């Protein structure tokens, strides 16, 4: 009986390993499980008998891989993973991915039924204390198949081809090496290396069309930090007017007055900093910069300098 329990526990552990990474060699699995390669092969067969499609490939880069089957087998979740899954499903119900809300609620109800009372109370506490703001009416939701295609391509280092429409309505075809998906809550972005432009790009998923994984893979190149790169891109380059401003206050103090992702900062000595931000109109930038609460000067462009001057004249007239 003890041996049966040990074998069952090992098979469960093996399944957890296969779910955690795309490919494992037999030697790696044997080392992690503390058994021989022969035992690993027997346990793989047990998983297949239970309906888990475990694929095996030989040669360089080969190994065992958990594939997609005709039916969806059970997933193994530890307590922390179960709570994380429930929280993510609640957020997805009001998120920016098209058609996911109802499916997320159905999945959440199934998870809630089998969750221990202790974990259920943790999830309920998070839900009761959290309010989710949905996407704006002007935001376009991302299709789930686009999101999944890009996520798999990032994971597997697979080339992607896609149509793309930029801010001005120009349509181009892109050949990409996808690296990372970044979400701001309202929108999804892909940081990728553009093979034709030979440079990194930040692309909005809702502006992509006909997204396809080509089936060919690439070798990962040194990449910038995805969150920082996309943050810089969406704070300025997506707007027709981009301004640089010197604030006469330390960078850490000024940065606290800007919402995340709306500007980039660089120190300009111990008591000043340079801020770069963008907007649809110069007047928006003038008003925004003035409400930060610190003295500043606009370095560029001329349109924003003029807008700040006009706003200053208007405010002076208002207090006569």
UniProtKB/Swiss-Prot annotation:
Transcriptional activator. Acts as a transcriptional activator of the MSMEG_1357-56 operon upon genotoxic stress. Controls adjacent genes that belong to the DinB/YfiT-like putative metalloenzymes superfamily by upregulating their expression in response to various genotoxic stress conditions, including exposure to H(2)O(2) or the natural antibiotic zeocin, as well as mitomycin C (MMC), diamide and UVC radiation. Upon genotoxic stress, upregulates two genes encoding proteins of the DinB/YfiT-like putative metalloenzymes superfamily, MSMEG_1357 and MSMEG_1356. Disruption phenotype: No difference in the growth behavior compared to wild type strain under standard culture conditions or in presence of 10mM or 1mM H(2)O(2), suggesting redundancy in the genotoxic stress response. Residues 245-320 are annotated as: WCX domain. This is Stress-involved WYL domain-containing regulator. The gene is siwR. PROSITE patterns: HTH_DEOR_2, WYL. PANTHER family: PROTEIN PAFB (PTHR34580:SF3), PTHR34580. May be part of a putative operon containing two genes of the DinB/YfiT-like putative metalloenzymes superfamily, MSMEG_1357 and MSMEG_1356. Residues 24-43 bind DNA. Keywords: Activator, DNA-binding, Transcription, Transcription regulation. It comes from Mycolicibacterium smegmatis (strain ATCC 700084 / mc(2)155). The lineage of its organism: Bacteria, Bacillati, Actinomycetota, Actinomycetes, Mycobacteriales. InterPro entries: CBASS_pafABC_assoc_protein (IPR051534), DeoR_HTH (IPR001034), HTH_11 (IPR013196), WH-like_DNA-bd_sf (IPR036388), WH_DNA-bd_sf (IPR036390), WYL_dom (IPR026881). GO terms for biological process: DNA damage response, signal transduction resulting in transcription; regulation of cellular response to stress.
